[in-house]
UniProtKB/Swiss-Prot annotation:
The lineage of its organism: Eukaryota, Discoba, Euglenozoa, Kinetoplastea, Metakinetoplastina. GO terms for biological process: chromosome organization; DNA recombination; DNA repair; telomere maintenance. One of its GO terms (molecular function) is ATP hydrolysis activity. Its main location: cytoplasm. CDD domains: DEXSc_Pif1_like. It comes from Trypanosoma brucei brucei (strain 927/4 GUTat10.1). This is ATP-dependent DNA helicase PIF3. SMART domains: AAA. DNA-dependent ATPase and 5'-3' DNA helicase required for the maintenance of genome stability. Keywords: ATP-binding, Cytoplasm, DNA damage, DNA recombination, DNA repair, DNA-binding, Helicase, Hydrolase, Isomerase, Nucleotide-binding. ATP binds at G247, S248, A249, G250, T251, G252, K253, T254.
Length: 812
């Protein structure tokens, strides 16, 4: 769609949500107020599917290019109308909130950082050409030279600020303006303003570590020996450099990431262990990249999801496995969002990013859309290295040489002819790999139907609805039948002011939860979210006490009640009651609907009932102990009552108690006993997966108890990427579709040629993406010490400054 615009108009796009529905309104504002020069034309580009929306204002110098995020616009929901800018637009910048929400990108860093900054008094992204910015600059504020996202106070201009200049701030109805006027009127303003700005920016970037980013160490690492190239990479990572770790299949990339995670966390750093696929995230013991940072899913209609700013601020290091499945545009957006969330201009906002993967394995489905990840500008901030020592196959093994040829696109007809042989031995020890999911599912169903033994169906058990995190008791505030029911933004503003007045603490907006009270038409439940070690309700004048101190409970309850009563009074409402636990009928029905949707889309496999029979072949899909891991296969020998002695042990101590909720509800009266190919016999307990717990569900969620098992006869190549398979593996390429590196990934899942059988393969199926091959060949050999010297201009993570005495150099 193309819109021709007059020279005095520029179009902004904003979106508003109501429950599950949304609409888009394009509003035109006069251009003369916003830009110093005329615009020749303005064009709005949008995608029918999931492409990004871009607003392009063209002049002689092409003044601005603002990307408004990957959201879908329905034609029927679009309205275009010109209107004049209002006073509130310039005073509050509310119409520009879409810039903060979606991020600012697609134009050079120097241009962007010079055009916008974060207002410390509102936490919003503010354009330098707007009225708010001009007023702040006139009062002595200016861009920080070190960090253009921030403002600094020039005390030499304090004497130049007159009472007349402050008068509009004193009489303003906006709270932050009045507070700023009072601050500038103080005798010690020269020092107080700078201190207040520093404190406010610290509040904006404050964060807590969410449970999804809390990853345990893998106890199996203590028995593993790192190769020389792995040790070199660890040394480089401990110096704070961002890196890309490449290497062929079986070179120990996942093991290396776990070792880096352990070293960095032992230094006191907070590390996000993520992967782009569910299988890879299970191998790491972390979570998916999209879940960790709230990545909006392309193509989802009506999505309300935004990047999780708290996650960016809560960690020091981000580890991303299987990064080849991220395209250049998404990786670029990730880097921009990190800088915006952390208010730092350095690459990734000062985060250390350790990406890992093999671009000669499976990548995203359509690389032509955004280009591979390594073609992004952000990827240049990573030191590229390559692991060269194989841990899956022995060096000099003919099979290792065959894989090396496949990796670069060479087809050995004689070798593959030898691999096309009949299956021998026990058919239960055979895993079939297919290019397409439907073929794998069909084989699993057929094999299960062939068995005439006892069958059991294990349906996932849902835990009770619960709040995920640490919260204050909820206060029920009611406005009866009054028509002037305040908006959520107004409630948050007044509540923040009362918390500041009573406790002396500033609260970040995202820690305030305002939830409609179920069937009550004009009532809300209000609570605060806080970290485990800090409860703002017992703070006074900026101080804090340890949670759990003496008489803390009484002080907390007293302060919280006073805050709620004052807030309700100012908003002409009434505080009815404070609940330690929300009444079930007060939880909005939309919460259950959202949780149902959250379960159906990303966790469809988890919520589907699992059918098992005695004698069926299964694969374990979680890392449960040193010897029972994701990819282990075995045969179901029995169904029996839970026996703790048969549960896999992650440590040498007694196994963790079985889920008490499951026992109480008798959700799993019998559990499968599996004999693994190694001979070990284990009983598989249900594991819990948390669904929800996000702002869209008012932080409500529930546990889903599922068995960490799946039928183990057939899988797709995409499903087993990153796994080492046991027993005989049969690859059937009969229904092959054009996909680079597919055959190489499938063949490299085993340790030896004796395990592999390949059928219906042809030379034209061996496809290698040339650009990926060129990139991989240019990687530095990690086994050579000098290759890890950082290039000129390579920056280190911001955590280096505070932990410099603990750093380990390459020469140590």
């Amino acid at each position: 769609m193309r819109l021709a615009a007059e020279s005095s108009l520029v179009f902004f796009v904003s979106h508003f949500y109501f429950e599950r529905f949304f609409s888009f309104v394009m509003v035109a504002y006069t251009l003369d107020t916003l830009f110093a020069s005329d615009i020749d034309s303005a064009t709005l580009f949008y995608s029918e599917g999931c492409g990004p929306i871009r607003l392009v204002a063209l002049s002689a110098q092409m003044r601005r290019l603002v990307r408004l995020g990957p959201i879908r616009v329905a034609k029927a929901c679009v309205e275009v109308r010109p209107m004049a800018p209002t006073k509130e637009f310039f005073e509050e910048g509310r119409q520009l909130q879409h810039i903060e929400a979606a991020g600012v990108g697609d134009f050079p860093d120097s241009e962007r950082s010079g055009d916008t900054f974060v207002n410390p008094f509102t936490g919003r992204l503010t354009p330098t050409w707007g009225r708010v910015a001009k007023e702040l600059f006139s009062l002595g504020f200016e861009h920080s030279i070190v960090n253009p996202f921030r403002l600094v106070w020039n005390p030499t201009k304090a004497a130049l600020v007159s009472d007349a200049a402050l008068q509009p701030f004193r009489t303003s109805t906006v709270t932050w303006r009045r507070n700023l006027a009072a601050l500038l009127s103080r005798r010690d303003a020269a020092d107080a303003v700078g201190e207040e700005i520093h404190r406010l920016y610290n509040e904006i970037t404050s964060a807590y570590l969410p449970p999804k980013l809390d990853t345990m160490h893998d106890p199996r690492l203590s028995t593993m020996t790192m190769t020389p190239d792995q040790q070199n990479v660890i040394r480089c990572a401990l110096r704070g450099y961002s890196m890309f770790i490449g290497g062929s299949a079986g070179t120990g990339k996942t093991v290396l990431l776990k070792a880096i995670h352990r070293k960095l966390t032992e230094m006191g750093l907070r590390v996000a262990m993520t992967a782009t696929t569910g299988v890879a995230s299970v191998q790491l013991g972390g979570c998916t990249f999209h879940l960790a940072f709230g990545v909006p899913i392309k193509g989802e209609e009506g999505t309300r999801k935004r990047w999780d700013s708290n996650a960016f601020r809560a960690v020091d290091v981000v580890i991303i496995d299987e990064v080849s499945l991220l395209d250049a545009e998404l990786f670029e957006t990730f880097e921009e969002e990190a800088r915006m969330a952390r208010l730092q201009q350095s690459p990734f906002g000062g985060l250390q990013v350790i990406a890992c993967g093999d671009f000669l394995q499976l990548a995203m489905m359509d690389v032509s859309i955004g280009g591979p990840c390594y073609q992004s500008h952000a990827f240049r901030h990573l030191i590229p290295v390559c692991l060269v020592t194989s841990m899956r196959q022995a060096q000099g093994d003919p099979f290792c040489e065959l894989l090396g040829q496949l990796r670069v696109g060479k087809f050995d007809k004689k070798a593959f002819k030898a691999l096309d042989r009949p299956v021998s031995g026990d058919a239960n020890n055979v895993t079939y790999i297919f290019p397409r999911r439907c073929d794998a599912q069909r084989l699993n169903d057929e094999k299960l139907c062939e068995l005439r033994s006892e069958e059991m169906i294990f349906a996932p058990q849902r835990g009770p609805l619960q709040l995920v995190g640490n919260f204050t008791p909820a206060g029920l505030v009611d406005w009866g039948r009054k028509k002037d029911f305040p908006k959520r933004e107004k409630i948050i503003t007044v509540l923040s002011e009362e918390i500041k007045r009573i406790t002396g603490v500033d609260i970040v907006d995202h820690n305030i939860v305002v939830m409609p009270a179920g069937g009550e038409k004009n009532a809300v439940l209000i609570r605060l979210r806080h970290s485990e070690d800090r409860n703002v309700l017992i703070c006074k004048n900026g101080g804090s006490k340890e949670h759990g101190a003496s008489n803390e409970g009484g002080a907390e309850e007293s302060h919280w009640r006073a805050i709620l009563e004052a807030t309700a009074g100012r908003l002409k409402g009434k505080l009815h009651q404070i609940y330690n636990q929300d009444p079930h009928n007060f939880i909005p029905p939309s919460v259950s609907l959202m949780l149902a949707d959250a379960s159906l889309h990303p966790n469809a496999e988890l919520i589907s009932p699992l059918r098992l029979k005695l004698g069926c072949r299964v694969m374990i899909n979680r890392n449960l102990s040193r010897t029972v891991s994701n990819g282990s296969v075995g045969i179901v020998e029995a169904f029996a009552a839970p026996n703790l002695d048969l549960f896999p042990r992650r440590h040498e101590t007694s196994p963790k108690a079985f889920h008490t909720w499951s026992l109480e509800r008798n959700g799993f009266q019998r559990l499968p006993i599996v004999r693994l190919l190694s001979g070990e016999v284990v009983q598989l307990p249900p594991l819990s997966v948390m669904i929800g717990g996000t702002p869209s569900t008012y932080f409500y969620g529930h546990e889903l108890f599922v068995l960490p098992l799946q039928l183990g006869y057939g899988f797709t190549v995409h499903k087993v990427q990153g796994l080492t398979l046991e027993g005989t593996v049969v690859l059937d390429c009969k229904k092959f579709f054009e996909c680079p590196h597919l055959v190489y990934v499938a063949c490299s899942r085993v340790r030896s040629m004796d395990q592999l059988i390949v059928r219906n393969v042809r030379s034209d199926m061996i496809i290698v993406r040339q650009s990926a091959l060129d990139f991989t060949n240019a990687l530095r050999d990690a086994s050579v010490m000098s290759s890890l010297d950082p290039p000129d201009g390579c920056t280190r993570a911001s955590w280096v400054r505070r932990l410099s005495p603990l750093l380990v150099g390459l020469t140590d």
